[in-house]
Amino acid sequence: MSIVMQLQDVAESTRLGPLSGEVRAGEILHLVGPNGAGKSTLLARMAGMTSGKGSIQFAGQPLEAWSATKLALHRAYLSQQQTPPFAMPVWHYLTLHQHDKTRTELLNDVAGALALDDKLGRSTNQLSGGEWQRVRLAAVVLQITPQANPAGQLLLLDEPMNSLDVAQQSALDKILSALCQQGLAIVMSSHDLNHTLRHAHRAWLLKGGKMLASGRREDVLTPPNLAQAYGMNFRRLDIEGHRMLISTI
């Protein structure tokens, strides 16, 4: 798989790094670790929203060399939960994120996949937290999906599963898997270790802004690594063919 993004000695004050790594096309990479590990700081840096020490190459060019307009064409970024910036119909908010605004069938498909069919006419300031999260997810998917944006390369998601129920999480997993199969690189933070063990291709385990381990999910999410990150003991079990992590006292 080709390298989409290369990080070299990336650091920000005392919150992050220095750390290095690469993001590959067609893979799902999870950032895991305790609160304050630096996951959100790292995602914002990878999105080009902040600057600091070290270097990031995106599609072979320095990240800081990308204009905001060009960057929005090649990568999409979901930050942590935000309140709606202003009131507008959901369909209008989603349309603003589409590069090809004639693709109404794609908008309807993505909205349907996230159970937003009956919310398209509702104002964004009348949504519950979970509904707004799904609208924001639909927006970044519409922005970056290769179906309508052949230039799309990278999707960055900060705790995308927040406020989603089990069925909605499953629906999002299907969407992300489909995007991955179309060649998109996906990087997301997660607090659900078992979800990472099932759905990620690779993982970066962070603590205190440092990278404790990186590599294949099963090689990173080991009881010794997790004990070092979280300060508690873990066991990894195989239950009916599924691997599962549990904490132990």
From Swiss-Prot:
Task: Kindly list the GO molecular function terms attached to this UniProt entry.
Answer: ABC-type vitamin B12 transporter activity; ATP binding; ATP hydrolysis activity
Which GO cellular component terms, listed alphabetically, does the Swiss-Prot or TrEMBL entry include?
plasma membrane
Q: Which residues bind ATP?
A: 33-40
Compartments, as annotated in UniProt: Cell inner membrane
Q: Which residues form a coiled coil?
A: none
This protein's membrane topology, according to the annotation, is: Peripheral membrane protein
InterPro entries, from UniProt? AAA+_ATPase, ABC_transporter-like_ATP-bd, ABC_transporter-like_CS, ABC_transptr_BtuD, Metal_Ion_Import_ABC, P-loop_NTPase
Q: Name one Pfam family in it.
A: ABC_tran
**Where does it mainly reside?**
membrane
Q: Which UniProt keywords apply?
A: ATP-binding, Cell inner membrane, Cell membrane, Membrane, Nucleotide-binding, Translocase, Transport
Function in brief: Part of the ABC transporter complex BtuCDF involved in vitamin B12 import. Responsible for energy coupling to the transport system.
Note the subunit structure: The complex is composed of two ATP-binding proteins (BtuD), two transmembrane proteins (BtuC) and a solute-binding protein (BtuF).
Q: Which family does the record claim for this protein?
A: Belongs to the ABC transporter superfamily. Vitamin B12 importer (TC 3.A.1.13.1) family.
What is the protein named?
A: Vitamin B12 import ATP-binding protein BtuD
Source organism: Escherichia coli O157:H7
High-level lineage: Bacteria, Pseudomonadati, Pseudomonadota, Gammaproteobacteria, Enterobacterales
